[in-house]
């Protein structure tokens, strides 16, 4: 970060309340986008002379997710997989993370946009697992959850149809594996960050749709979701 703050122009963004003809609903206007820009600037200013911490990167992603809204409908889902040793992420949703009662301030509400899980790369010892489980129970939010990369690799190799030599992650609900970077024989990533689509797909219902139209849309959405997930 060089200390330079770019300027932005949101004059061409649809005004708040403008009707969305294709999707339906109303536009959110430029204010959420401006709020994101200001939030990002403050995060970078607070990290002058150092790298962003894991929780700062997490918060930036959550804030982006918060403003991804179309027609008043949330259009984002997130998951953060963190190291066992990352205490910041362990407590990202612990206690009264969502507000500050004495000041009536909504502090970290954007963190509700993401599910958080620890990513085990090997079987933990009993005490480490117990500490993590205790933290989950005491958080009041049921997080961080637990994701096991070893188990994910075994699951990917199970039917023999997929190359298991990747660093596996999952979609935000953790019901499907998503491929990350390819790894070498020493377990080190040898490609970029990887990336794969989630299996979730959505059907938009229009006032003019018939039953036949809806059945066709559901069929196509099912096919698309299957392709995305494989």
PLM ranges: what are they?
Residues 1-29, 33, 137-230:
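Function-dense linear segments that define catalytic or interfacial modules
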Residues 4-7, 47-59, 71-81, 229-230:
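Flexible, glycine/charged-enriched surface loops at secondary-structure junctions
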Residues 18, 42, 62-66, 199-202:
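Contiguous, well-ordered alpha-helical segments that form the cores/surfaces of helical PPI scaffolds
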Residues 25-47:
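Glycine-rich and small/hydrophobic secondary-structure elements
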Residues 31, 42-43, 63-166:
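Conserved, charged catalytic cores of large soluble enzymes
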Residues 32-40, 56-64, 129-132, 196, ...:
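General structural feature for long, well-ordered alpha-helical segments within catalytic domains
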